[in-house]
Amino acid sequence: MSRSARIRRIALATGTVTALAATLFTAAGAQADPAPAAAPDIDVKAVKADLDQLQSIADANGGNRAHGQAGYKASVDFIKGKLDKAGFKTQLQEFDNNGAKGYNVIADWPGGDESKTVMSGAHLDSVDAGPGINDNGSGSAGILEVALAVAKADLKPTKHLRFAWFGDEEDGMVGSQSYVEKLGADKSKIDSYLNFDMIGSPNPGYFVYDDDSRLEKVFKDFFAKKNIATEKETEGDGRSDHAPFKDAGIAVGGLFSGADYKKTEAQAKNWGGEAGKAFDACYHQSCDTSKNLDDKALDNNSDAIAHAVWELSS
């Protein structure tokens, strides 16, 4: 064989192998699973519109939305109505406390592995003293808009998604405790529970639950990308609806923007706001109205909820 013919044959063989490799690579790429879609931005105007509705409900019902009061049941009907319209499977879970009937709103998004349920929750009730717009209309409205975003995207999660609005948290997590007790053997099907209690405090901090490192990392990574420093949540530790889940051995996480603890100088440097003042000076008071909010914190935390729901359910 001549040298030139040998070179031509080698070149031909090399080209064939290269073409075959390219074909295989292209086919493999076409068959690869697509990357999960990123969570959408949650419109803070929509969250605030929900809070305005909760304020109107309180105004029309004696100034509060407390357990056993007409304002609470009207809040339940408002939340459930929006979820039903969006295509969620909803149920009202009843319980009794202090001689009054309470309600949890439970909403399941069809699809996903129900043996691995990612659950997000917030308490819907206020104290008797006021409308409870930050505590905890903020968390309730935040997860409502995330749930509606799930429906709008027609999300097809790998894990099942459930949202909950608990009653009578203010008397000691009564609604969430009732829910967890009724789970029975189905406790093992809850992959994680995320709690959102006060996410729009007017002098806000950015606190992340550290009860489970996997869930904590999801939130911390989100805020790190936005150059927002976070701290470990300690003020509300064991004082909100995540506690019954944690006691049952379920992984819990969540966010909190502060209540009646005072912001330090270092925190004011990181987050802005006023050092020496409470994160929420209207905590459990009549002034916890729709004016008692920080829009930026409400926006950032609502987006963080969406990020966690999308990531943990994929």
Language model segments and positions:
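Extracytoplasmic/secreted proteins, especially bacterial periplasmic and envelope-associated proteins
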Residues: 46-49, 53, 70-90, 138-145, ...
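Metal-dependent peptidase/peptidase-like ectodomains
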Residues: 41-42, 166-263
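His/Asp/Glu-rich mid-to-C-terminal helical/loop segments that flank catalytic regions of hydrolases
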Residues: 264-314
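N-terminal capping segment at the start of a domain
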Residues: 34-70, 125-126, 279-286
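Sec-exported extracytoplasmic/periplasmic mature domains
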Residues: 52-60, 80-91, 147-155, 180-185, ...
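A non-catalytic alpha/beta surface segment that caps or lines the substrate-entry region
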Residues: 52, 56-110
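Alpha-helical metal-binding/catalytic segments enriched in His/Glu/Asp
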Residues: 107, 120-173, 305
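Secretory targeting and sorting signals
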Residues: 1-32
